[in-house]
């Protein structure tokens, strides 16, 4: 007569499986997040190359997409949205081959037409010189970051407005935790923006 498992033995097996899962799952999720961060930085590098190529041909960086300047700008509730389709650097000249580049960490708080649902882009010179010349943020930021900057919401999946002004976002720093507040940025003068930055860690 074969003897089956006792209840205690089954509970021990279940407990062992639970312990192994508790160890493996967080490590898997952390590795997945690190992989997405690497992908974001690679995509930002590709976009940066396209922006610089556009600037060489046109003597200026692309304008911000939410100005509605480009035909075919994507719309949400009748308003142009920045960055869903990179028309300016994909049409009519294809500085990038894929105009549908999306942020792996898309903003989970899409509540208004001007919230970003993919990588954000700032024409820093236009903001500093034409739009907000009296701002305490944009002119110094233009001097620090150069003519443009690109950004991702980062692993916390939201643009973090916790700085001295609503125009500034916290920088993502993996030493604060793989999933921690902060955004991933790349700019003309900073190939991979890392803390510290102007305005007490704001960007």
Where are these regions (language model features)?
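Conserved hydrophobic/amphipathic alpha-helical signal-anchor segments
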Residues: 28-78
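N-terminal single-pass transmembrane signal-anchor helix
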Residues: 2-29
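Low-complexity, acidic interaction segments enriched in glycine
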Residues: 58-203
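A generic fold-level signal
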Residues: 2, 39, 142-145
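N-terminal hydrophobic or amphipathic segments with adjacent small-residue motifs
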Residues: 9-16, 53, 148, 171, ...
């Amino acid at each position: 007569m074969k003897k089956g498992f006792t209840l205690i033995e089954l509970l021990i097996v279940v407990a062992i499986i639970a312990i192994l899962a508790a160890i493996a799952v967080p490590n898997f999720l952390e590795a997945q997040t690190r992989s997405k961060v690497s992908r974001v930085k690679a995509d930002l590098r590709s976009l940066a190359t396209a922006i610089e190529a556009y600037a060489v041909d046109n003597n200026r960086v692309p304008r911000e997409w939410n100005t509605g300047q480009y035909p075919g700008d994507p719309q949400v509730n009748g308003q142009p949205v920045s960055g869903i389709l990179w028309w300016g650097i994909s049409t009519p000249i294809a500085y990038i081959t894929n105009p549908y580049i999306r942020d792996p960490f898309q903003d989970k708080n899409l509540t208004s037409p001007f919230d970003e649902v993919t990588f954000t882009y700032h024409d820093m010179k236009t903001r500093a010189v034409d739009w907000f010349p009296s701002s305490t943020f944009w002119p110094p930021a233009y001097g620090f970051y150069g003519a443009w900057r690109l950004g991702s919401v980062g692993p916390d999946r939201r643009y973090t407005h916790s700085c001295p002004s609503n125009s500034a976002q916290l920088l993502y720093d993996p030493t604060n935790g793989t999933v921690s507040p902060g955004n991933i940025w790349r700019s003309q003068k900073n190939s991979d923006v890392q803390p510290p930055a102007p305005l007490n860690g704001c960007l």
